[in-house]
Amino acid sequence: PLAKKHNVKILPADSEHSAIFQCIQGLPEGALRRIILTASGGAFRDLPVEKLKEVKVADALKHPNWNMGKKITVDSATLFNKGLEVIEAHYLFGAEYDDIEIVIHPQSIIHSMVETQDSSVLAQLGWPDMRLPILYTLSWPERVYCSEITWPRLDLCNVDLTFKKPDHVKYPSMDLAYAAGRAGGTMTGVLSAANEKAVEMFIDEKISYLD
């Protein structure tokens, strides 16, 4: 509402929301049918659920694709970050929660997708490097040339693109985020604050991963 009041645009810098923003450029009003947020699955994507009780802080901080700070890396392991991104997408793009989906994409090459009313799916691809979405935010609506010295260009013949449904038993935070978003009010803030404290205590080794 504040952005609308002052007639300004909010430009997302997060890789997933930047991808969505790029995909909807030029779409007519009402064309968006579904948002598909991709998630790497974090440090424990290949770990059986029954093994989670054994994991330590050092294990949670071993992200397979991204180089990030401790807090966001733990949030990636629990998929809480993706839950927050669902809430963000709801407010940024006006999508209903039923129309926002999470899929596991282990390679983190596709940063998110949108489905249009005619069932076409548009995607934004790139290496898992936050410099690119930040650059787009700073240069929008222009595109700044980047040489291969800055970062290598994407070679689709040498990457895999796979997808799978997220395990709601392994990643219960997804359901909590959807529930908080639908509840509205201060619930999303309460959930975020609770997670902040839980992650802090886990990193300080005061609680276990499953606590």
Curated annotation (Swiss-Prot):
GO terms for molecular function: 1-deoxy-D-xylulose-5-phosphate reductoisomerase activity; isomerase activity; manganese ion binding; NADPH binding. Its cofactor is Mn(2+); Mg(2+). Pathway: Isoprenoid biosynthesis; isopentenyl diphosphate biosynthesis via DXP pathway; isopentenyl diphosphate from 1-deoxy-D-xylulose 5-phosphate: step 1/6. Mostly expressed in flowers and, to a lower extent, in leaves. Pfam families: DXP_redisom_C (PF08436), DXPR_C (PF13288). Keywords: Chloroplast, Isomerase, Metal-binding, Oxidoreductase, Plastid. It is found in: Plastid, Chloroplast stroma. Induction: Induced by jasmonic acid (MeJA), salicylic acid (SA) and UV-C irradiation. The keyword Chloroplast applies. GO terms for cellular component: chloroplast stroma. InterPro entries: DXP_reductoisomerase, DXP_reductoisomerase_C, DXPR_C, DXPR_C_sf. The keyword Isomerase applies. 1-deoxy-D-xylulose 5-phosphate binds at residues 15-16, 40, 63, 76, 81-82, 85. It comes from the Eukaryota. It catalyses: 2-C-methyl-D-erythritol 4-phosphate + NADP(+) = 1-deoxy-D-xylulose 5-phosphate + NADPH + H(+). It is an enzyme of class 1 (oxidoreductase). Mn(2+) binds at residues 14, 16, 85. GO terms for biological process: isopentenyl diphosphate biosynthetic process, methylerythritol 4-phosphate pathway involved in terpenoid biosynthetic process; response to jasmonic acid; response to salicylic acid; response to UV-C. Its EC number is 1.1.1.267. Enzyme of the plastid non-mevalonate pathway for isoprenoid biosynthesis that catalyzes the NADPH-dependent rearrangement and reduction of 1-deoxy-D-xylulose-5-phosphate (DXP) to 2-C-methyl-D-erythritol 4-phosphate (MEP). Required for chloroplast development. PANTHER family: 1-DEOXY-D-XYLULOSE 5-PHOSPHATE REDUCTOISOMERASE, 1-DEOXY-D-XYLULOSE 5-PHOSPHATE REDUCTOISOMERASE, CHLOROPLASTIC. Belongs to the DXR family. This is 1-deoxy-D-xylulose 5-phosphate reductoisomerase.
